[in-house]
């Protein structure tokens, strides 16, 4: 199947990383189901790129949604879902806009803030992946690409709830890759490799916007992962900043990639004999 016949469902598609990835995929002939809670942002995306029948917006708030219903609506519109990009995220700005200068202690985070981050950054990945994966398995081809964050961000003080919720997504990605091994459906992670110039970084942040990474940093690893060259690549995480455009794609992927999570530190528990 050619790119022009592949359909991508991408969450958080109205702005930031999701918008850049969606546009990049549209430009290469993919059909894109753009999911976001921001209806105006989805309209603006369509106005920017046109794309005719290749682009359709779906309004959904991932803190409270029916994943099976959303997947069915996308399949009804496009016929199938070949690629799922779990990109939507809630950052630390929901706790307080100046979190870079004054990182919140975990006990300063409200239960609602915790629940919202877990809902979007972790639960939605599980729910949507579960909703779309069985037809992928039946077709013996599929891609699930999860956007997490740096391992350091997951663990350092002041990162609650963003860091722990992304750590959950990272661990889930590793489990999903193992569960789907040999099915033709791959699971991989992409991260930018640093702070990115998106609305997730509040205006109060002490950064010059042009000094931040730009959202298009995600495109080289993404476009490689959805290509036939990556048919047998699963359980890996790729840093956009480490992708070397001067190398051949496979060599660039080798340089930018590593196993998902922290497998080099993992020791499997001793299992009782049966």
Explain the meaning of each model-derived region.
Residues 2-33:
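Canonical Rossmann dinucleotide-binding motif of NAD(H)/NADP(H)-dependent dehydrogenases/reductases
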Residues 28-44:
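Conserved glycine-rich Rossmann-like NAD(P)H-binding loop of the short-chain dehydrogenase/reductase
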Residues 46, 50, 56-59, 64-79:
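Conserved amphipathic alpha-helix within the SDR
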Residues 90, 102-126, 141, 145, ...:
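Catalytic Tyr-X3-Lys loop
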Residues 134, 178-179:
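Alpha-helical segment proximal to the catalytic Tyr-Lys
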Residues 155-164, 175:
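Active-site loop-to-helix junction immediately N-terminal to the catalytic Tyr of the SDR YXXXK motif
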């Amino acid at each position: 199947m050619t790119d022009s016949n592949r359909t991508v469902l991408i969450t958080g598609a109205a702005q930031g990383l999701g918008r850049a990835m969606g546009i990049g995929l549209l430009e290469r002939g993919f059909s894109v189901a753009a999911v976001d809670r921001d209806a105006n942002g989805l309209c603006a995306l369509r106005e920017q790129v046109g794309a005719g029948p290749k682009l359709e917006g779906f309004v959904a708030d991932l803190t409270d949604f029916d994943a099976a219903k959303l997947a069915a609506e996308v399949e009804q519109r496009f016929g199938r879902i070949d690629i799922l990009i779990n990109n939507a995220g809630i950052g630390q700005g929901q706790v307080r806009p100046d979190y870079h200068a004054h990182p919140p202690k975990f006990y300063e985070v409200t239960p609602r803030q915790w629940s919202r981050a877990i809902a979007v950054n972790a639960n939605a990945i599980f729910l949507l992946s579960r909703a779309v994966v069985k037809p992928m398995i039946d077709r013996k081809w599929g891609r699930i690409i999860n956007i997490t964050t740096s391992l350091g961000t997951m663990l350092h003080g002041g990162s609650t709830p963003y860091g722990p919720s992304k750590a959950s997504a990272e661990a889930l990605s590793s489990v999903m890759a193992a569960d789907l091994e040999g099915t033709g459906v791959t699971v991989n992670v992409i991260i930018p490799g640093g702070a990115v110039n998106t609305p997730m970084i509040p205006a109060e942040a002490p950064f010059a916007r042009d000094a931040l990474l730009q959202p298009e940093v995600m495109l080289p690893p993404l476009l490689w992962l959805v290509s036939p060259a990556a048919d047998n690549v699963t359980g890996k995480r790729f840093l956009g900043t480490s992708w070397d455009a001067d190398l051949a794609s496979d060599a660039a992927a080798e340089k930018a990639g590593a196993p998902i999570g922290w497998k080099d530190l993992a020791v499997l528990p001793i299992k009782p004999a049966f």
